[in-house]
């Protein structure tokens, strides 16, 4: 019979996704067949599986940590906000519809038996399932129809461990408030608490631990020290802490336009881990500076984000940068924005029917109701072999003054040839639909060499850090950190359904 444990949090960005990934790697290293599961994920960061199904990036990185291929069953429901009031609802990798919050709140009850069936299929194939909740289980205005926190735990009778982020402050209030806002049945499901991102001497924390255990009758089974691990971040909350000022000691200054509806910002994780590269997110004109490369990322609402560029003055700044021989790369929605105009006659993404683009590429995009979701391999215009994935609802046509960026050779593992993207005559402006393009070592190394040569400097002096190898190392570090700082015997008892009591044992931080 499958063992299961559910990680819920006191708030968004408490560390749920990372904790799930770490536990997956920890159990994998112990020889267990383990998978992650999140019934419903709201995110603009998504991935395409080998079967062409769309799922949340968090469950992809958790699957990597577990040593298994990403499977859409690990994230059956994906919500991708299109604006402040509406989301695209995706079930088992395929679009169902666009819904507002009220409509979806009523509709999601119909998904419960389907979610249960999906979960059972994973349970039949694995030793352990590590479930992840969303936000906080104490969203008392939504709990009557919850399918992702206590509602999911009840569906499969999963024990819950609550994780709280002490780095933000108010950790004991958040633990107590979360538990006490739950009803009696829900409170009974919380079997343990983990305090995350702790800095300092745990002895100073112990009086608070003793008091919160007495108040809630729930044991604190771990205190995880703050660790500077280089892991993918899925929650858009994490973008608020990203740099906006360049590092003067870096060899290259790369600026990413932080669009209001930015999607797939995990595309830039490969850039973040490279030595002597300054990566910063530009939110307004004052932060633009003098970058060596500007990247326009993907967007879930390209037309409205194009309007943001116009209103913020960033459109003119990017155009001026390009006119002065600056290098600009657009990914997916960013590629569409580089063109002359974008048309949305069926209002697929926005109420706007048409908007002018940046005019840096001789291209035109029309939005279609059919989404393209594929994994691809190909060869760029300069001969680099690349792989990645596509997620878009637009069709872009090139004019005579542009050439293709990449020749696609295989789609979802099957031989298929077509052309992707566009590149300007002077080679300075590149647009592509390929997410994950920067994860290709040769392409990235050549890009750095080109940017440095343009500054009359020698080529990039470091070996490109391979993202896959780097992530494997980080997953192992994370697993070791958790094993050293969680009372694993207590966690095992929780997973077996055994009762554990508040302990007088004091946790000791281990780096």
From Swiss-Prot:
Instruction: Please state the pathway this protein functions in, per its UniProt record.
Output: Cofactor biosynthesis; adenosylcobalamin biosynthesis
User: Catalytic residues?
Assistant: 332, 435
Classification via InterPro entries: Class_I_gatase-like (IPR029062), CobQ/CobB/MinD/ParA_Nub-bd_dom (IPR002586), CobQ_GATase1 (IPR033949), CobQ_N (IPR047045), CobQ_synth (IPR004459), GATase_3 (IPR011698), P-loop_NTPase (IPR027417)
GO biological processes? cobalamin biosynthetic process
Q: Which Gene3D superfamilies match?
A: 3.40.50.880, P-loop containing nucleotide triphosphate hydrolases (3.40.50.300)
Domain GATase cobBQ-type: from-to ranges: 251-443
Q: Which family does it belong to?
A: Belongs to the CobB/CobQ family. CobQ subfamily.
| PANTHER family hit by this protein | COBYRIC ACID SYNTHASE (PTHR21343:SF1), DETHIOBIOTIN SYNTHETASE (PTHR21343)
This chain's protein is named Cobyric acid synthase
Species in which this protein is naturally found: Listeria monocytogenes serotype 4a (strain HCC23)
């Amino acid at each position: 019979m499958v063992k299961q444990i559910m990680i819920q949090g006191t708030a968004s960005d408490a560390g749920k996704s990372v904790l799930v990934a770490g536990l997956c790697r920890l159990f994998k290293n112990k020889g267990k067949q383990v998978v992650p599961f999140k019934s419903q994920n709201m995110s603009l960061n998504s991935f395409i599986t080998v079967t062409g199904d769309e799922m949340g990036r968090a469950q992809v990185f958790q699957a990597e940590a577990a040593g298994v291929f990403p499977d859409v069953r690990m994230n059956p429901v994906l919500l991708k906000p299109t604006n402040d009031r509406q989301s695209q609802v995706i079930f088992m990798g395929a679009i169902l519809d666009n819904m507002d919050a009220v409509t979806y709140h009523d509709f999601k009850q119909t998904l419960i038996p389907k979610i249960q069936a999906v979960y059972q299929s994973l349970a039949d194939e694995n030793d352990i399932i590590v479930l992840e909740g969303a936000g906080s289980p104490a969203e008392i205005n939504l709990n009557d129809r919850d399918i992702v926190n206590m509602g999911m735990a009840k569906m499969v009778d999963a024990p819950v461990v609550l994780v709280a982020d002490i780095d933000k402050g108010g950790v004991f209030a958040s633990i107590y408030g979360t538990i006490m806002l739950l009803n009696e049945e829900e409170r009974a499901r919380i079997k343990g608490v983990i305090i995350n991102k702790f800095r300092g001497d745990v002895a100073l924390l112990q009086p608070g631990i003793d008091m919160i255990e007495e108040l809630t009758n729930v044991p604190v089974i771990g205190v995880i020290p703050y660790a500077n691990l280089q892991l993918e971040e899925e929650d858009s909350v994490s973008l608020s802490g990203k740099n906006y000022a360049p590092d003067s000691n870096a060899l290259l200054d790369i600026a990413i336009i932080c669009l209001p509806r930015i999607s797939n910002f995990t595309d830039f994780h490969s850039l973040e881990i490279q030595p002597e590269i300054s990566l910063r997110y530009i939110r307004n004109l004052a932060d633009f500076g003098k970058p060596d490369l500007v990247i326009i990322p993907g967007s879930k609402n390209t037309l409205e984000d194009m309007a943001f560029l116009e209103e913020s003055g960033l459109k003119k700044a990017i155009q001026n940068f390009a006119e002065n021989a600056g290098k600009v790369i657009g990914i997916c929605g960013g590629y569409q924005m580089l063109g002359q105009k974008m048309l949305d006659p069926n209002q697929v993404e926005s109420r706007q029917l048409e908007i002018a683009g940046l005019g840096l590429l001789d291209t035109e995009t029309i939005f279609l109701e059919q989404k393209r979701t594929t994994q691809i391999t190909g060869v760029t215009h300069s001969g680099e072999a690349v792989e990645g994935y596509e997620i878009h609802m637009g069709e872009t046509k090139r004019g005579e003054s542009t050439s293709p960026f990449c020749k696609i050779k295989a789609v979802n593992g099957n031989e298929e040839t077509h052309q992707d993207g566009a590149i300007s005559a002077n080679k300075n402006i590149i647009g592509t639909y390929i997410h994950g393009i920067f994860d290709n070592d040769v392409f990235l190394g050549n890009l750095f060499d080109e940017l440095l040569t343009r500054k009359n400097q020698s080529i990039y002096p470091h070996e490109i850090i391979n993202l896959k190898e780097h992530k494997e190392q980080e997953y192992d570090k994370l697993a070791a950190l958790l094993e050293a700082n969680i009372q694993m015997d207590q966690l095992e008892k929780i997973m077996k359904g055994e009762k554990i009591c508040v302990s007088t044992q004091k946790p000791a931080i281990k780096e």
